[in-house]
Amino acid sequence: MDVHTRWKAPRPGAPLLSSPLLLLLLLLWAPPPSRAAQPTDLLEMLDFHNLPSGVTKTTGFCATRRSSKEPDVAYRVSKDAQLSMPTKQLYPESDFPEDFSILTTVKAKKGSQAFLVSVYNEQGIQQLGLELGRSPVFLYEDHTGKPGPEEYPLFPGINLSDGKWHRIAISVYKKNVTLILDCKKKITKFLNRGDHPIIDVNGIIMFGSRILDDEIFEGDIQQLLFVSDHRAAYDYCEHYSPDCDTAVPDTPQSQDPNPDEYYPEGEGETYYYEYPYYEDPEDPGKEPAPSQKPVEAARETTEVPEEQTQPPSEAPTVPETSDTAGKEDNPGIGDYDYVPTDDYYTTSPYEDFGYGEGVENPDQPTNPDSGAEIPTSTSVTSNSSNPAPSPEEGKDDLGGEFTEETIKNLDENYYDPYFDPDSDSNVSPSEIGPGMPANQDTIYEGIGGPRGEKGQKGEPAIIEPGMLIEGPPGPEGPAGLPGPPGTTGPTGQMGDPGERGPPGRPGLPGADGLPGPPGTMLMLPFRFGGGGDAGSKGPMVSAQESQAQAILQQARLALRGPAGPMGLTGRPGPMGPPGSGGLKGEPGDMGPQGPRGVQGPPGPTGKPGRRGRAGSDGARGMPGQTGPKGDRGFDGLAGLPGEKGHRGDPGPSGPPGLPGDDGERGDDGEVGPRGLPGEPGPRGLLGPKGPPGPPGPPGVTGMDGQPGPKGNVGPQGEPGPPGQQGNPGAQGLPGPQGAIGPPGEKGPLGKPGLPGMPGADGPPGHPGKEGPPGEKGGQGPPGPQGPIGYPGPRGVKGADGIRGLKGTKGEKGEDGFPGFKGDMGIKGDRGEIGPPGPRGEDGPEGPKGRGGPNGDPGPLGPTGEKGKLGVPGLPGYPGRQGPKGSIGFPGFPGANGEKGGRGTPGKPGPRGQRGPTGPRGERGPRGITGKPGPKGNSGGDGPAGPPGERGPNGPQGPTGFPGPKGPPGPPGKDGLPGHPGQRGETGFQGKTGPPGPPGVVGPQGPTGETGPMGERGHPGPPGPPGEQGLPGAAGKEGTKGDPGPAGLPGKDGPPGLRGFPGDRGLPGPVGALGLKGSEGPPGPPGPAGSPGERGPAGAAGPIGIPGRPGPQGPPGPAGEKGVPGEEGPQGPAGRDGLQGPVGLPGPAGPVGPPGEDGDKGEIGEPGQKGSKGDKGEQGPPGPTGPQGPTGQPGPSGADGEPGPRGQQGLFGQKGDEGSRGFPGPPGPVGLQGLPGPPGEKGETGDVGQMGPPGPPGPRGPSGAPGADGPQGPPGGIGNPGAVGEKGEPGEAGEPGLPGEGGPLGPKGERGEKGEAGPSGAAGPPGPKGPPGDDGPKGSPGPVGFPGDPGPPGEPGPAGQDGPPGDKGDDGEPGQTGSPGPTGEPGPSGPPGKRGPPGPAGPEGRQGEKGAKGEAGLEGPPGKTGPIGPQGAPGKPGPDGLRGIPGPVGEQGLPGSPGPDGPPGPMGPPGLPGLKGDSGPKGEKGHPGLIGLIGPPGEQGEKGDRGLPGPQGSSGPKGEQGITGPSGPLGPPGPPGLPGPPGPKGAKGSSGPTGPKGEAGHPGLPGPPGPPGEVIQPLPIQASRTRRNIDASQLLDDGAGESYVDYADGMEEIFGSLNSLKLEIEQMKRPLGTQQNPARTCKDLQLCHPDFPDGEYWVDPNQGCSRDSFKVYCNFTAGGSTCVFPDKKSEGARITSWPKENPGSWFSEFKRGKLLSYVDAEGNPVGVVQMTFLRLLSASAQQNITYNCYQSVAWQDAATGSYDKAIRFLGSNDEEMSYDNNPYIRALVDGCATKKGYQKTVLEIDTPKVEQVPIVDIMFTDFGEASQKFGFEVGPACFLG
């Protein structure tokens, strides 16, 4: 008999295997290891979910099902379906199984007869098939061709095409095939196949048909599974397709829509699986993706709360079985629900024992914490141990016949592994527990223990300022909401061809060709691929090829009749449609590293791309390691004075400063608040005797004492010897701050300090009076290179120069634009490091990608070569606090600092003289009662005097003696750096090279990399004194304080700080010479003298901590060519820099050393001189090529033409007189110079060559009147010519004759300040000026260029634990990492133990005179006498003994600071004090470090238009603009000064005869005129806009006037033509200005593709441009034209809207209105213009942001519906929302969850441009107390 026991899910901690019997059972039941029987879902593989052509969704086997809201899902297949796939996809890693099951739930069309599924081999032979219809056929043919077609198993008497649902299971086991129909009928047939049959998996699987078959399956199908286990067919109705009335059991089935419902006991152990054909009722639209692992399935498809999720590896238990299991009225066995697909069978082999699945897989360890109940049997019966009969035993029974029986009469021996008819039918499902399918291998894992309690709050961290303790990286945050899509970037370059995709599905079979006459054999060009190796990826043959092969083979099989004549070639059928993409193959193994490619030639220079929009700032990276200290850079520009910083921590004590003069006594401060009572102080010294007090009341009469003898007053005793040194007392509390001690004696004059750094340059002072001209100075050293000037006028194209010598390798280019950011990929295996590839071209800037996780920090790179000294950088951001620097030289004594905090108690100073009596302090707290002291001597009774008035305070005591010299203070802070060193000695003279032609100034080179640490330079000479600074502004007047009590006059204070300089006074009269003064005290240290000779090298100091990188210096001198270094790794592509302005030409450089000989160039024939070319666009720098090998010196080449002007060289020694350089651009106007001395008269020059005709001369003196000419016609008014290009300056003329002095002109008005002239050559050194005052802090320099890319950022926070990955192969051991950077100092450690007592101190000084000794023994008390009369006051008695400590007095004056005491041990932290009053507002602190970038804030309202900004500084000279239209003729100018006489003209030919004029009055005969020049009368040259015709040269014999008129007329015509040409050009290519608007932004982009995004003027309706309006052009998005909502339409702040009704339009709100739109200047856009803009646009786009608090904007995630979605009213009065407009989508839908503050961003991107912009919005989800919303309306953008 079976004894059933069960495993109960143990409580945590309960032992699971408590009996040895269970262990024995586990050992007996251990199954043999077997491969997992993983069902393969053919419908999933054929992509039924995406409904391919001919497939639709329909209701499945069950219209309703218990515990499920939705019906089963099935697929209706029509004749149009063409579905096939390579068999390899079904079994990618293995062969087709010998024994298997085919399971399907199907409803075939009534009366049909077609194959449901067919499997073909590589040659196109059908190997497997299932035909549905009357008498179904199971077709099977193995690799040996067995069984033949006549032996295929046939199942007569069964009709599967009756139009009803059937559950069909076919089990193929050895040489039997069993059909189980509808869980009732079982028919077994003999299958005469070979002993080891093979089904080829290199062919294809067709669904619903056979190749060349006319019959195609039509009907509905819900499931079609292949299982690699023949026993799965017997479980079909329990595990895969249960009955409709079967409730969803406790089994962890994949269909469970709500896993919580099946655990009434609340254990919360849930499994999550997917089932592909039953829709999740909570999300009907979801199509779950298959997954290979149950754990991953749960993670990928559903979010399950943490407490409920459990990995599905715990063993579920067995279903309930009973005797009724096989009855026809209850075909479902047990309470099984829908069967899972891949997920469920991932690790589950079938066992060869009964339903008790309680034994682990031998590979798995046992986990005693399993939470499942497993029924076990204590008896090992034949039911659970006998294997199925072998085929030999069953052969005679089965034979060729088949047995037909119902399931209840199953052969027990055959079926008993699955069915136990003797099982206890009384076992209830609750006892058995959650069911476990028979095919689930059990893996026991622990149930999680109960959640621990929250731990106690940790101690607060001790983090000091500037200390950064890096925590462990946090868990990865949840994925952020997807950002709104960026604007469309420019089209990228064509990518590399992708890998070949998987083969598509086979196409439709072609139509039959017409039968042709006999002909040649057709050879189809198929590539028959041989079988790949095991593990090769994907099928070797495409699906189309397999299908064609199958067609051929099928045709061959069909032609089994007598051979007919050979047919002609038939027409090929049409190509079927491409199949859908197959599943992507697994990633291939990494191939071996390929050989390094040859360096490609540099590509052609691309056109410069448009400048991308600036990306948003990245997160701030961690500061990199401090680089080595660089060379001292040139002084940068002075920064603006920063805001006042926080008060720094008190620095270490500086050396004692020079004693200052006594300051004046300050006003008395206000009385401070009363302090807390202090602890009782130590016993004070005996105070001076106070004034006699008032008489007290008579005391109580005491007891009479025994009369004692009255002793005489003894003489005062001598002071005793000094006592021994006592032990040091306990450390006292810190005393109060002592008073400032008297100034010490003046110390000896210290050594002059090191010269300080030159101060920041002050602003230029006012110009001084002009001094007398100095004597001519000697040739000064060449000055520093001046700033790069504005570009001069474009020069004439120079002739080609000599070919230059080969240059050294260029510096690294700047980074390119960042590319598109990709999604974060899966972390791949660590590959081998490949060789660096060649640098690619710069890609266009992509839109900003989603922020990826921070990468791991990279390894430190090797130190680069020392770079050249760069240009001075601009001030960078403040760095993080660096490590403590090394101790610098002692600085100068600083100014008196503010009062420091209380110091540690000093050692006691020498005793000062007694000060005056202080006023009586307030009463202190009661002290501790002291021990009774010894009795003092009785004093004489003094009479009580009347209380005297309080006397005045005594005078201040004399100043104490100066104290001893204090110990040396700690070293001061680092001094300022020294002045720049002198120029080094001149290097060795190089070989004199041939003089190179002067070159053109090149653009500024890229910034060099940080060089290694240079040697410290020598200190430079002191700079010139700065000019007088401007006076500062006066401070605000403070509030008047309360008058304090009158103080005593103090000693003179130290001199105050130097005041600001006053306004410059008028010059006073010259005073008389004074008397010689006496010798003054030694002055302050003078300016540093010139450096002495270099001393011997000192010992090498320790390597200092690396300093912060200094500012970028200017370019240093070019170093000699270095040895080629090892090739570094490929750097990142640099960004194209903006072209800098062309600098002014520098002076001619020194003769350079001869370069290396270059290759010989071939001698070309000289070309003709070309005309001047247009200015080309600046191309981006090409990639730097590799350094070539040094060539052999070639033969000397022929002299080439002079090259272009070279770059400005460094200043060398003065060379010989160079050849004349190019004329420089005109400099700014200089100051008026003094008149020069008259020059000597020069010699008469030679007669020059004939020059070109000069400009018209001035009007000459009147000649003798000529004969009257004829009357000419009146001339027309000509247009002025266009402005000519500026000619090059002529050679200097000879000095003119000195003119007579003119009269003194009137005083001119004060002129505006002229522009700064260029730097003059360095003058001779002037006399040493007085040291100037420190100027105010300079203005801040301009913002610096972006720095080099920072080091990699700190590792980002760790992400959430991802799904466990597969274990990777062991990696190769990594290289030894470079040592990490030095860690920052940790927090202060705990106080150390108290040290041993120190050595005995030095012997003390001799003590002062001791107090009076103690009295003698006490005598007996005498009786109290009567009170006598008040006597006269007696003499003051001797000092009594020290009394009891008196009350605490007021705080005395601060004592002088003692020397530093040793630091005491660290005390325990005190209790927190009471909260103090809030202090005054502190000064503004230093700007903090730049924080991490916060999340983007909500869009703010558009601000009001700001006030006009201050006048900006004049910008650089712009590029030459388009020539403007001719202006109107100006008024005639005044006659010019007479010019010099021109050269004699050449003889001209006689002009044409003019018309005869009227006879004039006869005049005097004049002298004959000079012959004139012939000038072309018609300057018809369309390209010239400047006329070289001089009207004075046209006058010849009075007949030239007609020519003048004619020429002037032509000039007017040409001016008009030029204007027309400009206007036509602007019409063709509008500029987007108000006078020349474009039609749309798209038009503007087409004409000017290089324009940046911004505001431009458009005029969509064209015509007059006065109605144009200004829009925002988004060229990055392809040329969108954007208009904005007006200020009141931009949106509304988030609020609860209590008075508004949900479902009403915003325009009906009290604060609402219809939305209206304006242009970029705030003017409304006209309706007509908007209409034309829409006509010119193909699509329109607008974003709306809904800011919510627990309010839905679009989808309601709780219900999955869009009932509460916002509705919009378009410009065409059309309502738009989710239900009627597919062009609205949610870019971000944070409001769907109704959790806290969120936002939803909706985008309308519609081709119906008349809908945009929206004019009204309807909101529906608000009104409850906890709901709020606001919204923001974005611009409407139209794209043409």
From Swiss-Prot:
<feature type="region of interest" description="Triple-helical region">
    <location>
        <begin position="561"/>
        <end position="1572"/>
    </location>
</feature>
<feature type="modified residue" description="4-hydroxyproline">
    <location>
        <position position="641"/>
    </location>
</feature>
<dbReference type="GO" id="GO:0035989">
    <property type="term" value="P:tendon development"/>
</dbReference>
<feature type="modified residue" description="4-hydroxyproline">
    <location>
        <position position="791"/>
    </location>
</feature>
<feature type="compositionally biased region" description="Low complexity">
    <location>
        <begin position="1544"/>
        <end position="1556"/>
    </location>
</feature>
<feature type="region of interest" description="Disordered">
    <location>
        <begin position="561"/>
        <end position="1576"/>
    </location>
</feature>
<dbReference type="GO" id="GO:0003007">
    <property type="term" value="P:heart morphogenesis"/>
</dbReference>
<feature type="modified residue" description="4-hydroxyproline">
    <location>
        <position position="893"/>
    </location>
</feature>
<feature type="compositionally biased region" description="Low complexity">
    <location>
        <begin position="910"/>
        <end position="919"/>
    </location>
</feature>
<feature type="modified residue" description="4-hydroxyproline">
    <location>
        <position position="698"/>
    </location>
</feature>
<feature type="modified residue" description="4-hydroxyproline">
    <location>
        <position position="1472"/>
    </location>
</feature>
<feature type="compositionally biased region" description="Low complexity">
    <location>
        <begin position="1261"/>
        <end position="1270"/>
    </location>
</feature>
<feature type="compositionally biased region" description="Low complexity">
    <location>
        <begin position="1487"/>
        <end position="1496"/>
    </location>
</feature>
<feature type="modified residue" description="4-hydroxyproline">
    <location>
        <position position="1469"/>
    </location>
</feature>
<feature type="modified residue" description="4-hydroxyproline">
    <location>
        <position position="1031"/>
    </location>
</feature>
<feature type="compositionally biased region" description="Low complexity">
    <location>
        <begin position="462"/>
        <end position="471"/>
    </location>
</feature>
<dbReference type="GO" id="GO:0043588">
    <property type="term" value="P:skin development"/>
</dbReference>
<feature type="modified residue" description="4-hydroxyproline">
    <location>
        <position position="767"/>
    </location>
</feature>
<comment type="subunit">
    <text>Trimers of two alpha 1(V) and one alpha 2(V) chains in most tissues and trimers of one alpha 1(V), one alpha 2(V), and one alpha 3(V) chains in placenta. Interacts with CSPG4.</text>
</comment>
<dbReference type="InterPro" id="IPR000885">
    <property type="entry name" value="Fib_collagen_C"/>
</dbReference>
<feature type="modified residue" description="4-hydroxyproline">
    <location>
        <position position="623"/>
    </location>
</feature>
<feature type="modified residue" description="4-hydroxyproline">
    <location>
        <position position="872"/>
    </location>
</feature>
<keyword id="KW-0964">Secreted</keyword>
<feature type="compositionally biased region" description="Low complexity">
    <location>
        <begin position="561"/>
        <end position="572"/>
    </location>
</feature>
<dbReference type="GO" id="GO:0045112">
    <property type="term" value="P:integrin biosynthetic process"/>
</dbReference>
<feature type="modified residue" description="4-hydroxyproline">
    <location>
        <position position="905"/>
    </location>
</feature>
<dbReference type="InterPro" id="IPR008160">
    <property type="entry name" value="Collagen"/>
</dbReference>
<feature type="modified residue" description="5-hydroxylysine">
    <location>
        <position position="848"/>
    </location>
</feature>
<feature type="modified residue" description="4-hydroxyproline">
    <location>
        <position position="656"/>
    </location>
</feature>
<comment type="function">
    <text>Type V collagen is a member of group I collagen (fibrillar forming collagen). It is a minor connective tissue component of nearly ubiquitous distribution. Type V collagen binds to DNA, heparan sulfate, thrombospondin, heparin, and insulin.</text>
</comment>
<dbReference type="GO" id="GO:0031012">
    <property type="term" value="C:extracellular matrix"/>
</dbReference>
<feature type="compositionally biased region" description="Pro residues">
    <location>
        <begin position="1108"/>
        <end position="1117"/>
    </location>
</feature>
<protein>
    <recommendedName>
        <fullName>Collagen alpha-1(V) chain</fullName>
    </recommendedName>
</protein>
<feature type="region of interest" description="Interrupted collagenous region">
    <location>
        <begin position="446"/>
        <end position="560"/>
    </location>
</feature>
<feature type="modified residue" description="Sulfotyrosine">
    <location>
        <position position="236"/>
    </location>
</feature>
<feature type="modified residue" description="4-hydroxyproline">
    <location>
        <position position="782"/>
    </location>
</feature>
<feature type="modified residue" description="5-hydroxylysine">
    <location>
        <position position="644"/>
    </location>
</feature>
<dbReference type="GO" id="GO:0043394">
    <property type="term" value="F:proteoglycan binding"/>
</dbReference>
<feature type="compositionally biased region" description="Pro residues">
    <location>
        <begin position="472"/>
        <end position="487"/>
    </location>
</feature>
<feature type="modified residue" description="3-hydroxyproline">
    <location>
        <position position="682"/>
    </location>
</feature>
<feature type="modified residue" description="4-hydroxyproline">
    <location>
        <position position="932"/>
    </location>
</feature>
<dbReference type="Pfam" id="PF01410">
    <property type="entry name" value="COLFI"/>
</dbReference>
